[in-house]
Amino acid sequence: MNWYSDYKNECKKIIETVSAEIKKSELVIEKDTIQSMFLFELSKIELPYVFKGGTSLSKAYNLIDRFSEDIDLSMNRKLTQSERKTTKEQLIKIAESLGMKLLNPDQVKSRHDYNKYVFVYDSIFSPMPMEIIIETSFYQNVYPIGKHNIGSFVGNFCKNNDITIPVPFEAANVAMNVQSLERTFVDKVFAICDYYIQDMQDRDSRHLYDICKLLPEIKLDKELSYLIDVVRDDRMISKNNPSAQLKYNIPEMLKEIISNHFYERDYRDVTQKLLYEKIDYNQAINEGIAVVAKSDVFVYNK
């Protein structure tokens, strides 16, 4: 069985129509559709999965307008080892039910806090197999969370135009737990500081764009400052989150990132090409981390 089941020709026509109307490529519409089908199946499972990261900003909040192929998942409580094993089995089972194959089985270990599943699927629009990446991270609890509807290009197009498509598409209506905008904002600020300390900029400048888009939705107030301190305490535990250590001053580090143009080349060469809107590097900085750097919300108060 493949993701399009017995409806290959119908799916092809639907995706071509949506692609022409919303000015995004068929491959992007196709991948978004499969992501939604995956999340729909995941939403039926009892374990407390939480959808987070950049793709959630697009599919749950309709906030960003860039290409994102990853689905980032976590949980809102600590898992037992048995549940971790079950998680691995569930994700692979869902993928296989959609005709996808796991490319890196030897690199996925249920005992690990972080795993990257690389699945491939047969595309209607490409002779080459295409990838969908599912990332799971269980080293931190996810909070705050809320129930949100998960959108898709096909589902949104049908809803906006009052169209009923001639194929089953239950994934047009998906509701699941999603990490809050505030927490995603906090995580992304810490992430760009972590990568700066680790001298890693390749493909990480996308966070600058996301922060720029998140900031108008975020209040830089005492409530956010409290959340930042709580998240920082959690992040301190992991060696993979160096900027959470108290020896680092986040506002000053953001100023260094700006003055050193640390992410500029990657933003121009990679991130800007993934955007469906015109936001250049300077705008992303000036309307994003430059504003955060002038604020005191990331000053640790405990």
Feature names for model-found ranges:
Residues 1-49, 59-65, 76-302:
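Structured mid-to-C-terminal alpha-helical surface segments
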Residues 51-55:
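Glycine-rich beta-strand-to-loop/alpha-helix junction loops that act as flexible
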